[in-house]
């Protein structure tokens, strides 16, 4: 609604609308039209407007795509709320999380943390599960400096080979679940749309995809942590993945190994821990060295 308002004002008056104006429009106008908005956490609405504004600014400054209207049928639903006056609490003893406008919720807490809570993002994935991501301000201790550098060669047969000869196997996660997914997709095709059995099968497919994603991320996190911990400087090839997946024979295998996710993890973990991660040109003979 605020995106439509912003667009309408610009088309009629040729005037730019700020995120503060959009927030005021939401409080003064939209809450009158849609009574249920008064029941929603105010920070969730403000953050949604600020996210829309960030996407709008990105469209002009970084030539990104124009912000899209979100459908209520979107599989990925989420909102962010801010911490103030103890409105977000985590009880590790009772495994409960308290959020604004909600009572204490029982949760599976993955690990304890110490620090000041800044915000919480609540999301629902296609399988129907809910997740809460807590942003905490805490002191970070960098890894100790070491005199060890490495070059890594990314591949399909072996996911990664270091210049020291260390090999990380390709777990081929999609291949392991491929038969199960094909079977479930066939079952779904024979179900009556919008029936109870249709949604049950759809949920099974979503859970299978979720398992693939979580297994892959877990493997990549352990692998990237090991590479960062053992080396001060890490060098890899700057692969043009978008061009490579155009080869239909290799597309599935390339998507399964998730080179982009691995290099993304190496990049931010290197910054966190005082390491250096370097990407070299595609045409540099890195494979011969590794």
Segments and roles (model prediction):
Residues 21-125:
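Acidic carboxylate diad motif detector
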Residues 1-20:
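N-terminal cap/recognition module
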Residues 7-11, 60-65, 232, 270-277:
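Surface-exposed helix-capping loop/turn segments at secondary-structure junctions
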Residues 1-7, 48-56, 181:
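Short, Φ-rich (hydrophobic/aromatic) sequence segments
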Residues 113-116, 126-290:
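Positively charged, helix-rich recognition surfaces that bind polyanionic ligands
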Residues 8, 35, 39-42, 50, ...:
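Short capping/connector residues at structural and topological boundaries
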Residues 16, 20, 24, 43-46, ...:
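An alpha-helix initiation/capping motif
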């Amino acid at each position: 609604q605020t995106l439509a308002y912003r667009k309408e004002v610009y088309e009629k008056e040729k005037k730019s609308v700020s995120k503060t104006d959009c927030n005021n429009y939401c409080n003064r106008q939209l809450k009158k039209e849609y009574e249920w908005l008064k029941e929603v956490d105010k920070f969730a609405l403000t953050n949604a407007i600020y996210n829309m504004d960030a996407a709008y600014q990105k469209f002009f400054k970084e030539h990104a795509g124009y912000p899209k209207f979100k459908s209520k049928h979107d599989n990925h639903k989420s909102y962010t709320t801010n911490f103030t006056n103890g409105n977000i609490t985590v009880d590790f003893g009772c495994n409960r999380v308290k959020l604004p406008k909600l009572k204490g919720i029982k949760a599976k807490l993955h690990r304890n943390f110490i620090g000041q809570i800044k915000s919480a993002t609540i999301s629902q994935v296609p399988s129907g599960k809910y997740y809460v991501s807590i942003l905490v301000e805490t002191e970070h201790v960098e890894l100790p400096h070491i005199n060890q550098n490495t070059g890594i060669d990314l591949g399909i047969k072996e996911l990664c080979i270091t210049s020291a000869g260390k090999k990380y196997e390709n777990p081929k996660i999609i291949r392991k679940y491929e038969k199960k997914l094909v079977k479930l997709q066939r079952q779904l095709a024979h179900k009556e749309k919008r029936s109870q059995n249709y949604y049950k099968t759809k949920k099974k497919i979503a859970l299978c995809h979720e398992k693939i994603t979580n297994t892959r991320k877990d493997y990549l996190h352990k692998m990237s942590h090991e590479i960062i911990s053992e080396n001060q400087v890490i060098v890899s090839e700057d692969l043009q993945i978008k061009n490579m997946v155009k080869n239909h024979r290799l597309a599935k295998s390339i998507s399964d190994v998730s080179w982009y996710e691995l290099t993304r993890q190496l990049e931010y973990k290197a910054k966190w821990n005082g390491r250096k991660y370097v990407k070299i040109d595609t045409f540099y003979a890195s494979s011969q060295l590794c």
